[in-house]
Amino acid sequence: MTTTISLLRHGLVENPEAVYYGRLPHFGLAARGRAQAIAAGRYLADANISAIYHSPLLRAEQTAGLVAAQLSAPAPLIACDLLTEIYSPYDGQTIAAMEQRNWDFYGEIAPPYETPADILARVLAFFAHARAEYPGRHIVAVSHGDLIAFAILWAFGRPATGAAKRELIDCGVDDLYPAPASLSTFRFDADGALIEYRYHCPHDDK
């Protein structure tokens, strides 16, 4: 018996002020992001999805709903705090300011903000929860880029660090970082051991 968990990054966000939105409320999907989510849903339409978990943030909730609407059989939508965006001090900073930092979220932080190890612990706790709730099934979990990035590094036995996050191409992530509405799929055996990982971006399909 194997359990499959597909981590899906939310679609592209409407962000006219060009800020790092992080956990800020009211940031929903752009039209392109909705199309990306629909493409992911169509890709998963016949995958026998048993449930769609999602971060409580609006962009993830909207992505989950659009995916669910494409499935050939209904699947419950379940909000889960373990999937929410990283807790950092940079919410609301401009994209320009973040680019000057080289998007370094972790080099100068202290509690209560999250470290990569904290974030990975959340992802692994979610994996354990999902396997217990839906053993032998396939579920989708809509989350955020760094959570998915650290899960990928874990799958390849690499350290969860900000530096390692920049080397995801070595883990099969052709986009260098989990693309909007991309799928990172993890398959576990009955004992919870990871037996397969794959990355795919449905809206890139021709």
Regions found by a protein language model. Name each.
Residues Y43, L66, Q70, H129, ...:
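Active-site catalytic microenvironments for nucleophilic, acid-base chemistry
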Residues T4-L8, R137-S143, L147:
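Beta-strand elements within well-structured catalytic alpha/beta cores of enzymes
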Residues L12-Q62, Y113-L120:
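Loop-to-helix element that buttresses phosphate recognition and phosphoryl-transfer chemistry
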Residues M1-S6, A51:
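Extreme N-terminal starter segment of soluble prokaryotic enzymes
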Residues E108-P135:
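Internal catalytic-core helix/loop-beta-alpha segment
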Residues T2, A73, I78, E85-A97, ...:
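Acidic, low-complexity terminal tails and accessory targeting/binding regions
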Residues I38-G107:
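Phosphate-coordination/substrate-recognition cap region in phosphate-metabolizing enzymes
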Residues V13, L147-I148:
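Short active-site segment of divalent metal-dependent hydrolases/proteases
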